[in-house]
Amino acid sequence: MKVAILESIVMPAGHEVEFDRILIEGLKTQGYDPLFFVPEKFPFKFDYKTEVEYLAGGEVVSYAGAGKLEKIWRSFLREKRRIAWFNDAYKKAVQGKCDVIIVPTATYRYLRTLGNSYLKESPVPVIFVFHGINPDEKQKFIKFAKKCEAYPNIKLKIITLRDDFKADKLTNVDLIDPPVFRPWDLNKIKPVEKHQPLKLGFFGQYRREKNLGFFLDAFIQARFTVPVKLIVQGATAKPEDSAAFEKYMKEYSDYEEIEFWHRNLIGKEWHEALLSVDAIIMPYAAERYRYHWSAMLFTAIGFNKPLLQSPEINPEVLQKFVIGEALDMTSKGAFVRQLEHFVNKFSKNIPIYNEALGKANVLYSQENLIKNIMD
């Protein structure tokens, strides 16, 4: 069975790249024949070693560097091209070039586009994968999801740990668990162990909402009983985020125990960076993290890394598995004490972390993701 991944998102950080890799490799493992449907001149960040079909309609439209008026124009152009891509995907399905189409990172806007394209009448199943629905977008999602009920081959899958749609009785929506992100070389996955210095990692796409200054101040105030090294990596998409990250690099340049990496980490370099630390810190403060599954959290699980995270990040996981702690963000003093406790008790808690991470990896396996999408 040929399964087409209709991808049109280009991002600087690694999780979109990694999610597509999970799909491609997972589909192959379970006996499917995956391929990509992508816009013309699509800039792949990774060689997935799989077939590629290009979609007519123009190249991907980026908002990078666009002012207010320019962004409005690009938004219009993006929608126009998305309709064209969907129409061409429909043609390819009619021609028998695939048996299933998966749109791996959808929003309600994709369903609006679908309604204006031929793809809604697809002769093969078209599976839209959503990575969470914010409350302020829920009604828009429901509106377009209900319209899709008229088209039996349109399937909607929401990756979530919540159940916010029980009362809405949508017949075409399934809620599925998130997958862990794992190293390419599974032999490199090690149990949690004691190392000196204990390395803490702050990774991912940096946005100013991620409380980095609050965390750095707490880190330099904390008194640890073991040597500690902090790695702070930031991939930045917007100029204002890049400037903020550079500012932190200058402010904390005198602290030898803090190492900054202002660059994207893709593929092997990303995996090696994650494997090099003992624990992952996620002091991200934004309410939307309750509704969208955290790729960084599920990377930590897949790489067997205990974590310290803000309470907004998928709290359902820590309620099930003792793989770390939810941070007390009420004051810097409370944060400092918790950071000290986490680091100073880390060695003692290693057996607990290993058992919980093992169970979490089973529940949130990549194999389960593929089964849930294709079911």
Task: Give the predicted meaning of each segment.
Residues 1-14, 105-106, 201-202, 281:
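Nucleotide-activated donor-dependent transferases that construct or modify glycoconjugates
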Residues 7-21, 44, 207-210:
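A short, glycine/small-residue-rich beta-strand->loop->alpha-helix junction that serves as a flexible
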Residues 14-15, 329-375:
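A charged, aromatic-enriched C-terminal amphipathic alpha-helix characteristic of glycosyltransferases
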Residues 29-78, 108, 235-241:
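N-terminal strand-loop element at the rim of the active site
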Residues 191-210, 216-223, 230-231:
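Conserved donor-binding/catalytic core segment of Leloir-type glycosyltransferases
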Residues 229-245, 263:
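Glycosyltransferase donor-sugar binding loop
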Residues 243-271:
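Nucleotide-activated donor-binding/catalytic signature segment of Leloir-type glycosyltransferases, i.e.
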Residues 282-298, 310-312, 316-317:
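Nucleotide-sugar-dependent
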